[in-house]
Amino acid sequence: MILFPAIDLKDGQCVRLRKGEMDQATVFNDSPADQAAAFALAGCRWIHVVDLNGAFAGRPVNAPAVEAILAAVDLPVQLGGGIRDLAAIDLWLDKGVRRVILGTVALRDPQLVREACKRHPGRIAVGIDARGGMVAVEGWAETSAVSALDLALRFEDAGVAAIVHTDIDRDGLLAGPNLDATAALAERLTTPVIVSGGVASLDDLRAIRARAAAGLEGVISGRALYDGRIDLAEALAVLAD
């Protein structure tokens, strides 16, 4: 199972938010490229990057920081946040991003997701951020009337590489992931699912690893890695077993 260490970008810095609130950001590194290099040195196989400013603006904002990360590591990078059209998708994939994550646009314009999957097979993921089981969009500022499962099922035949499922109510709180909800989602899908939000301990990772058969491909971890609650080497070992 893959551990995706998270680099969330706000104003060019590596931060973590609490429950998606931009005014509750903690800066962990003012050099995202250095942070990515540290993750690579520790043995990570992927890097998960989110342009937080971009998610709210609806367009890429932290491009220089993303480009610095791509230059700093020889690892596959998946990128989300503010990617809302084919031009932005093409741009980032051409620049070396391995996989882009489409969130708001997946709800607003599902046909664009399908077109992107045709143009870039295996390189398009859908990010489903849920609050109380319902999809939230526009940088989590708006909660829709569509359930996470309903949205995921719309893309079952589209060729999506993965679903990134985030429980907003757990994100950045170190309260443990909503594993039951994510595993229940994964069991209904053929598309691999990545767990995100709330991971706080090695025991959380062991619980996720134990549910791999449900269709869980990996887990995204941020704050717990940065504040030392989870040792990165131990985390990689737990998920490799």
Swiss-Prot record:
One of its GO terms (molecular function) is 1-(5-phosphoribosyl)-5-[(5-phosphoribosylamino)methylideneamino]imidazole-4-carboxamide isomerase activity. InterPro entries: Aldolase_TIM (IPR013785), His_biosynth (IPR006062), HisA_bact_arch (IPR006063), Isoase_HisA-like (IPR044524), Isoase_HisA-like_bact (IPR023016), RibuloseP-bd_barrel (IPR011060). Its EC number is 5.3.1.16. Pathway: Amino-acid biosynthesis; L-histidine biosynthesis; L-histidine from 5-phospho-alpha-D-ribose 1-diphosphate: step 4/9. It is an enzyme of class 5 (isomerase). GO terms for cellular component: cytoplasm. GO terms for biological process: L-histidine biosynthetic process; L-tryptophan biosynthetic process. It holds the Pfam family His_biosynth. It is found in: Cytoplasm. The keyword Isomerase applies. Keywords: Amino-acid biosynthesis, Cytoplasm, Histidine biosynthesis, Isomerase. The active site is at D8, D129. It catalyses: 1-(5-phospho-beta-D-ribosyl)-5-[(5-phospho-beta-D-ribosylamino)methylideneamino]imidazole-4-carboxamide = 5-[(5-phospho-1-deoxy-D-ribulos-1-ylimino)methylamino]-1-(5-phospho-beta-D-ribosyl)imidazole-4-carboxamide. Belongs to the HisA/HisF family. This is 1-(5-phosphoribosyl)-5-[(5-phosphoribosylamino)methylideneamino] imidazole-4-carboxamide isomerase. It comes from Rhodospirillum rubrum (strain ATCC 11170 / ATH 1.1.1 / DSM 467 / LMG 4362 / NCIMB 8255 / S1). The gene is hisA.
